[in-house]
Amino acid sequence: MPFTRVAIPAGTSPAHKAAIARGVHEAMVAAIGIPEDDFFQLLSEYHPGDFLFDRGFLGVQRSDGVVVVQVTLRRGRSDAMKRDLYARIAANLHHAAGIRPQDVFVYLSENDFSDWSVGNGRMSMEIAMQREAGA
């Protein structure tokens, strides 16, 4: 169950927000195999001066329109899957929302199943184990 935070420039229209969210989610479904209904995203806007970055780090020329995609997910995806994810997110955001691929900054934070609670104050792993035992 990934949880995704997306930081976008202030003033992004609701239609572009929806396109960004959809583009990121579709990339995760295709590249790392998450279920279609495993959709948890938090979009937040940043204002000029709130996000400071090097415009040419590692030879990538960035503009004021940088979108930061932070995905927290369980361990276990291969480097090939991660490469595919990065490429798909950049391509989807370019096609769906007109965001330059150079302005798509993605990072992953991996953890374990026991690090999640998706509701009711219960560890998600316990809920999954209960369901498996009852099936």
Q: Which positions does each model-derived feature cover?
A:
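A domain-level signal for the structural core that forms small-molecule/cofactor-binding pockets
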Residues: 1-135
